[in-house]
Swiss-Prot record:
Substrate binds at residues 298, 348, 361, 456. It holds the Pfam family Peptidase_M20. The gene is UAH. SUPFAM superfamilies: Bacterial exopeptidase dimerisation domain, Zn-dependent exopeptidases. This is Ureidoglycolate hydrolase. It catalyses: (S)-ureidoglycolate + H2O + 2 H(+) = glyoxylate + 2 NH4(+) + CO2. It is an enzyme of class 3 (hydrolase). Residues 284-399 are annotated as: Involved in dimerization.
Amino acid sequence: MATSAAARFLAALAGAAVLLVLLGGAAGAVVGHDDDAAAARRTMEEFAGFPASDYRGDGGGGSGGSSPFYVDSDGLQRQIDELASFSDSPVPSVTRVLYSDKDVQARRYIKGIMNQLGLSIREDAVGNIFGRWEGSEAGLGAVATGSHVDAIPFSGKYDGVVGVLGALEAIRMLKRSGFQPKRSLEVIMFTSEEPTRFGISCLGSRLMAGSEELARSLKETVDNQNVSFFDAADSAGYKMHPEELHNVFLKKDDYFAFVELHIEQGPILEKEGIKIGVVTAIAAPASIKVEFEGNGGHAGAVLMPARNDAGLAAAELALAVEKHVLESGSIDTVGTVGILQLHPGAINSIPSKSHVEIDVRDIDEKRRNNVIEKVHQSAIEISKNRGVLLSEFKIINQDPPALSDKSVISAMEFAAKQLNLEYKLMISRAYHDSLFMARISPMGMIFIPCYKGYSHKPEEYASPEDMANGVKVLALAMARLSLQ
């Protein structure tokens, strides 16, 4: 055996041994005991034919150490930067909207990395992308991970992207270490987690979870340029018949577990100096659209007692949302009036129409729905008191919250402990594809800190160290789940 070949062979064995020790021998061995490490080392030397100390590796990405079980942080950051270049807005912002040219370029980039890793790649009718590493028992439900790469206008380059590129780096780590999965491992790039183009959050994962309602509504869905969903998909290379949407639906036994790596999008981990967040539940939002109609008129000629102001009705409802949310008595209940539009929108014209969009979230579905009902009653009362017409009060979506599965939480906690990383059990208050994957698979999420909790803005940032920690926890958790 040539020296270089022997070194590579030993490197793989060393990585497998390190992973074996971290995983507890995959058969109940006590993790971290000197006897286990020594036994693994002796096995490596026996197979390689020369002492393990002969191997020296650079660790990759500046991480150091002789084990192939490392994160190539430099390579991961480079990929994040390259993916960010596929944007319809100037640096440092990222804008990547569903089925746009930049979205298509990003998809090609992700598939290119999957191909380099030797994953088998498939795409469904709406463009969810799957890269699978076949396990030794491929008939078993797979262990999946992944996230999204679409980006709202003028946002940052880490939201979702860390969960896709980081997942691919986790697969690369496991392959490099010599790990052999029992259950197949799969990385998913979900289509349109953001609602930017068609007003539908988590479009791809929602369909994967079997949403008949969404499949029906997409037949009539258009964007703000009156381009239909199917025409937009066709322009990106996804030509389909409406009935093909049912082919996107997955069965509950397709996946044994799903784990998503994501930046926190909040300040808690950074503020408390904790490296890993283990998500126990995802708060589900309800979206509401409200419209009032009044008489309008000239801002100077119509006296105050004679006015039926649709704008003031909207303003009063916005305050009512805040009031009812605070009355819930729970810190986990939040409400946001994210859109308030007035017509005709002139400084010297009394608004004749107002349009309000409201987001209410909670991990307790009953409590959240109670807030929504109170907001509805307030809208009715405001309409009567102000003499305006409540022309629409429509609940756009009202998704149930999701709890992380105990088995996935256990795997994530195990991984963090083995890596000596402090972790915190926490709730996700942001929407994620995991919310819908929980309908078809045991689910869990790994959070890493992000700078000042910033997200959906150009200042969004996660450090290489924090990303590496998240990737390592993901890799170990997936490996453990794969062997079950």
